[in-house]
């Protein structure tokens, strides 16, 4: 068996180790593999000057409305204008400020929300828009940029020795993940929050002794390779599997089990994937996971937008889950140190199309921030009377991410070089929105 490894170099060996690890550990324990096998060591320049504002948030819950959330029917209503469509406004708990009738729970906690109504980008493509929102950078073929969770781990270090620092719930396969960072920054993906972290229990035929023997065999293969190639990225790749094994035996795995929650609490969040994902996010934050991202799909409403199973249903799912997440974190005194962000890749056209839907519209859309030192009870910026373009205080994705990074006390000016030697910052050239902090 010792001679096998010496004959397996490059991709053949990587495939073998990946197969062996999956057989031993279970597929779901492995993080996203984008960039894992090819990642090299990135370099950090000298420490940059501190931010102008010191953030107070310690953790991030990032809620992504996949498909392009309609701003005119959620957070940026235009009562009386012909573009408004069928959605009606309702009062919030802040005098004079209104939200959509489909968001009653969020209207009740509006004093904790800061709604940015002047978001804008240049792309109406889903994949490019999602990538830009999550990374602050345009998608290019020669570089993959990290999302916010891995950046947070980069600057703050590991906060939980057993659980991963970033967890992605219902995320698309094209998620940028750790980008050019090394494998130890890779997020852990959870497909279905109701099923938690799958494949963490060994099959009945696999005894503890057999498991240890399998792990020892893998370690033996790895040891020979590490001795032959004593490189930092080889060590990181090996450490990645060691951490996966540690996770399997950790008592903190119960954080992924929603059956620990009362049925009535699960009902409050909604029994759909997004509602249960937000509940799981709360549990993980309570276990000191630094970043949890939950994706809610179904917002690409090109037709029949006001049908009961389209906008009303989707907005209701989002409202119930996010509203109760805010309430629970506030009740547990965790909201002040937990930043919640809700965003999307672009808005939807103010003019309703001939299919009774709204099309892609990057010129104006909305994002929401709550907790983590955010000044609630306010709208920031505005779109024009038709909801077509930004009219005041335009905000680019990098500006939103700079505000998120500042709230989490990540250094905006610090430069990290990718393995290709290119310089990058957590929010690119974004400017943080000081009025929100």
Residue ranges and their predicted role:
Residues 1-437:
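Ligand-binding pockets and gating/stacking loops
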């Amino acid at each position: 068996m010792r001679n096998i490894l010496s004959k397996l170099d490059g991709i053949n060996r990587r495939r073998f180790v990946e197969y062996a690890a999956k057989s031993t550990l279970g597929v779901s324990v492995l993080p996203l593999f984008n960039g894992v096998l090819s990642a090299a060591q990135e370099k950090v320049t000298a420490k940059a000057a501190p931010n102008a504002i010191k953030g107070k948030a310690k953790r991030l819950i990032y809620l992504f409305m996949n498909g392009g959330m309609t701003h005119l029917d959620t957070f940026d209503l235009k009562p009386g204008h012909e573009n408004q469509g069928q959605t009606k406004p309702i009062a919030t708990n802040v005098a004079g400020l209104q939200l959509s009738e489909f968001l009653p729970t969020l209207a009740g906690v509006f004093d904790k929300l800061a709604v940015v109504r002047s978001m804008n980008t240049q792309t109406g493509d889903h994949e490019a828009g999602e990538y830009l929102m999550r990374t602050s950078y345009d998608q290019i073929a020669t570089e993959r940029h990290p999302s916010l969770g891995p950046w947070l781990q980069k600057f703050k270090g590991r906060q939980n020795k057993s659980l991963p620092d970033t967890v992605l719930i219902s995320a698309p396969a094209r998620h940028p993940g750790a980008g050019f960072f090394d494998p130890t920054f890779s997020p852990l993906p959870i497909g279905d929050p109701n099923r938690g972290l799958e494949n963490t229990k060994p099959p009945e035929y696999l005894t503890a002794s057999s498991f240890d023997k399998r792990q020892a065999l893998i370690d033996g293969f790895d040891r020979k390779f590490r001795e032959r190639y004593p490189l930092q990225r080889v060590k990181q790749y090996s450490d990645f599997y060691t951490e996966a094994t540690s996770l399997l035996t950790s008592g903190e795995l119960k954080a992924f089990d929603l059956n620990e929650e009362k049925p009535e609490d699960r009902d409050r969040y909604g029994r759909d994937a997004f509602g249960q994902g937000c509940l799981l996010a709360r549990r993980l934050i309570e276990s000191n996971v630094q970043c949890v991202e939950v994706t809610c799909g179904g917002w690409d409403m090109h037709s029949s937008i006001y049908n009961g199973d389209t906008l009303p249903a989707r907005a209701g799912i989002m409202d119930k889950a996010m509203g109760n997440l805010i309430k629970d974190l506030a009740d547990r005194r965790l909201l002040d140190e937990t930043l919640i962000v809700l965003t999307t890749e672009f808005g939807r056209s103010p003019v309703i199309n001939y299919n009774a839907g709204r099309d892609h519209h990057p010129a104006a859309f909305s994002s929401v921030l709550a907790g983590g030192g955010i000044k609630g009870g306010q709208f920031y910026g505005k779109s024009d009377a038709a909801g077509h373009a930004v009219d005041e205080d335009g905000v680019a994705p990098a500006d939103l991410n700079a505000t998120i990074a500042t709230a989490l006390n990540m250094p905006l000016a610090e430069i990290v070089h990718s393995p290709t030697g290119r310089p990058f910052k957590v929010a690119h050239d974004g400017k943080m929105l000081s009025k929100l902090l």
